[in-house]
Amino acid sequence: MYHFVSEQTPELRLSAEALVTSRVTQYLKSFQLDAVRFVYDRLAKREFCILNDESGLGKVATVAALLSALPPAKKTLVVLQNDEQLLTGWRFHLDTLTDLQVYIIQGVHDTTDSPHSVYLAKWSQLRSIGDLSRLKFDYIMVDNRGHSLNNSFCTSMLLKQFEGRVNVLISSVDITSDVKLLYNVLRLGDRLEHQYKSFSRFDRKFHLPDPKEVFSKRIDLEEYYKQRGFLSEYIKDFRLRRFRHQFDKTLPLVAPEQYKHNLNLWLASKNSQSTLSGSEVCSTVASIENNPPQQNETVLVEESDRISEHSVDDVVAMSPLIFESSESDDEPITVDPVANENPVLVVSSDDCEIVTPPNTPPNRTPLVNKSPRTKSKKKCSKKPSPCKEADLTDSEKDDEGLTMPPRKSTRAATVHFTPKTRRLNVRLLRVSLDALSTPTPSGATTAIITPKTEPSARRKNRTKQPMDVGRPATRGMQRLTRSAESKINSKYLKHHVLDDAKRNFPRRIKAEGNQTPKTSKRIVKQESKAKAKPEQKKKIKTVDKPAQETPKRKPGRPRKCKTLTETLGKSKTKPNSKPLPPTPQVLSGSSLSSEYMQCAQRIPDDLDAIESPAFRVPFTPQQTPMLLTLPSTHNLLNDSEVVAIPLFKDQVETVVINSSHDESSPQDPSQSRRTKALKRKRKPDAPVNSSFGGGLGLPQAKRSATNKSPDLFSISSDLSQIPLAQPRPSSPFEGFKIFGSEVKQFQQQHAKVTIPAPKKKRDRSCLDILEQMFEPRLQQSSKTSPKVLPTLPLIQKDDATTTFTQRRGTLLEDDFFEITNNGQFGSRMRLNASGEVSPVQQDQQSVRPTQANKITNYLIGSVITQERTQPSNGNRNSIVASLRKSPKSPKHGARTTQATKLTRWFGSVFGGGASQTSSVESVSAPSTPVNPSTSAAACQTRTARSGGATGPTKRKRLELFK
């Protein structure tokens, strides 16, 4: 009785008419006999019941024992998932445990008039038949072990044909884990109460949250299982649910090797009468062999239900949720053999391990005695090794040969061709499969000469090789070539492969560029070369092949290296790509100037040979050089992806002064160039709303009317500088860009420079009171001023934008530039056209007004909108002269000391006499449009008021609005 272990058990009397004989009960455990009683009690009353035992507890054997106790005249339909493996399992157990006649429904012409007792049918076959009214069954059972009820087509077909007529549902998954599944099951068994006929009412009563929410711990597990308990209580009278850990002493019921061996024996004995073809038998056994955890079930071929048995030995209360999440039934079985990247090589390596000689003699010996068809096949094969190929067609034999030959040369092929095969498409993989199979009949190499004799010779050699039923690759091969299985086995495709072989043999040394014949032909050569060593008996016929192969294999290896070095994207070319990591120095600003890297210029290959000049990189904080010299592995870029296109687009927009509004924050050293490029894409619209945002290192969103950064550059021909007003401490100066090189200044270092200044100001109570009294009101006025009419600051922004566009062209023409107001380099620094930066000693005359007027410059800058552009020296002199001639200045002889400027600002804020230039008064400006010349004059007036390069002078107030 195959793998079933006999125990001295008495027969099981279910009723006066039903008896499970001791011939059956001796192979069942006590808990399986309990399940037989449970199901029969409901079945005798024509009631619906659910056999919901966990996977591995022998549900199919239980049902088979139950069916053996029923009268043979009763006809039972078992609806299965669309899986040959499940179908074979049912046939195996019914044939082994019972004497019932089993019929498989396959088409429209099948009827129930035949003298069979059990009818097995896949739900897809029943759905294709359509009208099932002519099929009369006494009992209907649904096997949900393949999650068939999760398929809406299967559920709709069952509800349409068998609603209220199903007697037994077999399921390994806890059906209380899904409310919709339970609702459909109760509809099939006619167990729904009247108030729950509609699913909305049923769901309102027994609603369960989504399992995803449970897994993410957004829902209390105690409440979840409390609700699951309500469902279990609702169906407890007609459901049987038990777990594996309750019967640990008796599990596993069968060893996986023993089960596989006996299933092979049964398949071999039934092969001549089986409705399964040879390839389907092989695929069934191969799928069983590929999943060894699934064979722990004894009398039950629930291979698909057994994947999750390692996770179900936990607590009883937790097991239903775990089953639903981790229990995969039949679908993943077809996925597992093809899970690899390289299916051709995996197939051959699996054949190496699994097709072993010890398995073949027990499979062959009963075959010689039992099957006369196999004996006749053996006579024609000219080799004394019989095999179970009784029903194989020619195409199936060719399919066998595709995976069997590479057994002996798998390792050599794997070493040389794994990167190549990865690059081939499916069609090339199929061509290499045919090439793999061509040299294997080394005993009949003459057949390769003519294409006509090749398929017949191959068919002769197919029968010579012992076919093991436990080969795991057939399902994977069907998965690989599902759309063109017939093309692989057709002789026409083989003809083309042979023609290519004839054509490319002399051409291999000349044309080394084509890769398609190279890959397939090299596999052919290594196949035959490796075959020539173990097969010494047939060495006479194949002795001329290695002489041709040796010169042809040698140029193949360096050519493979050449093609690999041409494509730098592969992972095995890392030694060649090591010179490339310095390329971030070109793309990130301050390493090289624009002389080495223009916009959209190709990156030079010898970047390491280019030595950067001495003063190319200024004295900067430590984090910036670390960022520039990061290896390319820290960037999220491959070696072939060094050039970041968005960065080049950003450089094209600002040729001279690179836009740094998106780099105002301190650089994170782990930030990649791709991230920076993406950031530049996100924020290019910010300079539209601001004035002169391109050349400053301040974030545009934080600027207000009282929080403006000074201009960094002066484009005047004269190199003398105007001392600038200090920015607010809330907006630190964080960097500037010249010629594409950037100098970063971080928050900590700027805080050391600028934080003591607010403390000095806060010590004076007068300034503190002034800021608290007037600054909120002034900020409101500056914010609401654009709503009334375009005022001076807005016009000034337009002018600043135009001057910025002009500045791009003129900046490259000058030789020397001086940059002021930088805490790291002193107040002035000089930059020549080659990019060298040098500090400049300042004369005392220009330092003194800056030192004396720091506080007043801050106050003036906070009240009046700070200027963005500095006027030239000639314009400044004319403005000062016009100020002196103005008759309306209230104070003629006042020095621009600290007290004078403070009192002047105080008087202008309080609106005494001459307050028209304040930003408060600008709200009530006349409604006539102001021309740009007036705004330029106002800008220059405020620029001169903040202190000139010639020191403090006497000024008169200029009235703009009379």
Curated annotation (Swiss-Prot):
Cellular compartments per GO CC: intercalary heterochromatin; nuclear replication fork; pericentric heterochromatin; polytene chromosome
Primary residence: nucleus
Start-end of Polar residues biased regions: 438-448, 480-489, 564-576, 703-712, 866-880, 916-944
Extent of Basic residues compositional bias: 372-382, 553-562, 673-683, 885-894, 953-962
GO molecular function, one term: chromatin binding
Subcellular location per the Swiss-Prot or TrEMBL entry: Nucleus; Chromosome
Keyword Nucleus: yes
Keywords: Chromatin regulator, Chromosome, Developmental protein, Nucleus
Bias-annotated ranges (Basic and acidic residues): 386-395, 524-552
GO BP annotations listed: chromosome organization; DNA endoreduplication; double-strand break repair via homologous recombination; heterochromatin formation; maintenance of protein location; negative regulation of DNA-templated DNA replication; positive regulation of DNA endoreduplication; protein localization to chromosome
Stretch list, region Disordered: 353-413, 438-590, 658-712, 866-900, 916-962
Record bears the keyword Nucleus: yes
PANTHER family: DNA EXCISION REPAIR PROTEIN ERCC-6-RELATED, SNF2/RAD54 FAMILY MEMBER
Function: Required for underreplication of DNA, which is found in many late replicating euchromatic regions of salivary gland polytene chromosomes. Controls chromatin organization in polytene chromosomes.
Name listed for the protein in its UniProt record: Protein suppressor of underreplication
Gene: SuUR
